[in-house]
Amino acid sequence: MAGRATATATAAGKDRSSFAVTCSLLSQFLKEKKGGGGGLQGLGLGLRPAPAAPPAAGAGGAFRPPPTTMNLLSGLDAPAVEVEPNTAETAADELPLIKAPADQQSDESASEAAGEKAQQLTIFYGGKVVVFENFPSTKVKDLLQIVSTGDGVDKNTGTAATQSLPRPAHNSLPDLPIARRNSLHRFLEKRKGRMNANAPYQANCTAAPSKQANGDKSWLGFGQEMTIKQEI
């Protein structure tokens, strides 16, 4: 029993001696760190020293609040967030595509140029020529459908019949000499008839033979009167 008591006493003495050595080392370490970091703050335990007491208003002049410290390097300890490429592509695809007004106008003008090409349209109707500038090709089909419902239009080909249209003015030019010739003949016939019917010398000629015929026959009547008187 006595041996056990002595063993426990020696173990307790060793523990006390080791604790004392640890405390002495800690106090020495704090003394060394007091000049650089100061106390427990240099150990990295996150402890800050107590703020200093504000000086009296009359001793150093105006009252100044204690300086505040800001930890600007706190974001370096946070782990970096990595973005997967698949999620970035899907997010870009989900965004709505907005076109500028200039792009929309260029697309519309290109579609109009491809679908509706304006050309010159010439129509011959009623001896007149009508010309339309920049007439869209899509409206030509509508115009042919409207014209095809008429009577003087061939429904199979969609073109107007040439028989119903009057002759153009330039086709009557070769007929002008013939018309002049006919009018000249009519004028000569009228003048010839007038000369034969109303000429004064023809009237005198016709009157002279009638007088001569009457004079030749007068003696015949005188002879008859003489024979009648002799018989009486």
UniProtKB/Swiss-Prot annotation:
Recorded name of the encoding gene: TIFY10C
Motif placement: Nuclear localization signal: 179-186
Purpose: Repressor of jasmonate (JA) responses. Acts as a repressor of JA-induced resistance to the bacterial blight pathogen Xanthomonas oryzae pv. oryzae (Xoo). Regulates JA-induced accumulation of linalool at the transcriptional level of linalool synthase gene LIS. Linalool is important for resistance to bacterial blight pathogen Xoo.
Superkingdom of source: Eukaryota
Quaternary structure and partners: Interacts with BHLH148. Interacts with COI1B in a coronatine-dependent manner. Coronatine is an analog of jasmonoyl isoleucine (JA-Ile). Interacts with TIFY5/JAZ2, TIFY6B/JAZ4, TIFY9/JAZ5, TIFY11A, TIFY11D/JAZ12, TIFY11G/JAZ15 and NINJA1.
GO cellular component, one term: nucleus
Stated family: Belongs to the TIFY/JAZ family.
One Pfam family matching this protein: Jas_motif
This protein's name: Protein TIFY 10c
PTM info: Ubiquitinated. Increase in jasmonoyl isoleucine (JA-Ile) levels mediates its degradation via COI1B-mediated proteasome pathway.
Main location: nucleus
Motif (Jas): 177-202
Free-text domain note: The jas domain (177-202) is required for interaction with COI1.
Organism for this UniProt entry: Oryza sativa subsp. japonica (Rice)
